[in-house]
Amino acid sequence: MAHIYIALVDTPGFFASLIRHYLGQKYVHVVLSLDEQLSEAYSFGRRNPYIPLIAGFEREWSRQIAGAFPTAEYRICELDCTGEQKEAIRERLHKDYKNRFHMHYAAAGLLALLCHRKFYLKNQYTCSSYLAEVLGEQGIFISEKHFSLVTPKAVSYTHLRAHETGAYL
């Protein structure tokens, strides 16, 4: 049995506080990682941790994130998968990373999410909609909702083993 890891993050900051307020949840950001230390982790979010308005698909660098958000809280979840599923996810992450400047954060998707409306434009995602789509393509469903409606709160913890940490690993 292989594993992938999902980090749910309580990101500080003005934009995150708006999302937290309107969605009513503690964790407002998700990261998909191939290892427990999050050394190979990807997400849709800030291209630079200090500039919230420029966002897209990025590899998350733990030292840079920890420096920008030293008070952030994390919930690291382990998800069982097959070796074939993990390899397919790895290939998708690497392919998308090569094309990262053609992939954008779906800011309009946040508005649709607030209205409970499905939303998709090619290569535009929120962090949690990307996670749901990538996993769903491999038959790993973290929510019964359409991928564009998945939020960090919608991730079902019942099949995830998790621990909380106050520091980015």
Each model region followed by its residue ranges:
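Extreme N-terminal starter segment of soluble prokaryotic enzymes
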Residues: 2-4
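Glycine-rich catalytic cores of cysteine/serine-nucleophile enzymes that process amide/ester linkages
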Residues: 9-77, 111-118
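Active-site nucleophile-His-acid catalytic modules used for acyl/amide transfer and hydrolysis
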Residues: 15-22, 70-148
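Beta-rich nucleic-acid/ligand-interaction surfaces
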Residues: 150-156
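Conserved small/polar residues in nucleotide/adenosyl-binding loops
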Residues: 158-165
